[in-house]
Amino acid sequence: MPVTCLLSPTEYYQKVVALFQQKGDPDRAQGQMWYMRYQFEYFGIKAPEWLALAKTLFDEHGIPEGAALLETARLCYEDDHREANYFAIEMVQKVMKQQPENLIDFFEELIITKSWWDTVDWLAKLVGMHFLRFPHLTKPVTERWMASGNIWLQRAAILFQLKFKTKTDTALLFDYIRRIADSKEFFLQKGAGWALREYSKTDPEAVAKFIRETALSPLTKREGMKWMVKKGV
């Protein structure tokens, strides 16, 4: 039986921080901060460890519901430590299949908050899962993201189909990559190449043709062709 959460959002957040502080390694935290260019603080907990701690918290205290879920996640995301930010996403992911369609607004909020590839790429995956549940959201939301000028929303709009394989809306993917083809932003060039590389495993002919016929950055082309070159396709 799932545990009913009886903690307030603030109490839950305090439990998360207390446990993560207790289990953190300051020396490891220094290395983590260096790797992420000192943009975020860290408790010094590796992914398998904080995931295990998250499971402990979920098992003991349950997961908040309704507005309390988002309020708790938001408090964790406001914390300076990246592991607390990760916990927020993990908690929402655990129950996202029970959430309404407007959860997309919360995902958008997180994408543009403390934005970096680690959280944005994870959130893009969750966005894709959400769009599979609510397909009518896909085009209007991602069109708005592409028009926003925010590189992280644009990256998410390009990456949300990463694991869709035969379910990929090819026209949408190619259209969005064309729109940012002249961008000098590394994370857009790299993201576009990554999306093309993944889709090349499903339809190499379509990807090869697109790369041939589209003026893409050298980085995007190189990344997009990587799997096909390796496989000799």
Describe each region flagged by the PLM:
Residues 2-233:
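Alpha-helical scaffold domains
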